[in-house]
C-alpha cells in the first residue's frame, strides 16, 4: 500500500498529502501508516477520479502487473519500482541514469538482485513521469 500511494501521489493523483522518507523497504510515510490504522475495519468508500487520474492509476496497475518483473514476487516488484523512483528523485544526483539508480538499489537492498528486472523496473517507473 505504501509504495503504491507513494507512486500515485508523485504522479499527481490526489490520494493525500503524505511526506515520504527512506525506510528499510523503500519510501515510507508514518502519516499514511497512521491513516491506515485509523481506517482499518471501517467501511470503505468509493473514490471518484478524473479521467486523467484514472488513467494514471491504470498505467501504474499495468506496470505493477508487467511480465518484466521476472522472478520477483508482486511485493518485491512494487518495492523495486517505488524504491528506484525514490532513489532517483530524492537521493541520487539530478543526472543519475538507470545504471546509477539500479546500482544504488542493489547496494541498499541485496535481496533485489535481479539486475535485468531492476533495469526494466527503472525504465517502466520513470516512464510514468515523462
Task: List each model region and its residues.
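Domain-edge interaction signal
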Residues: 1-130
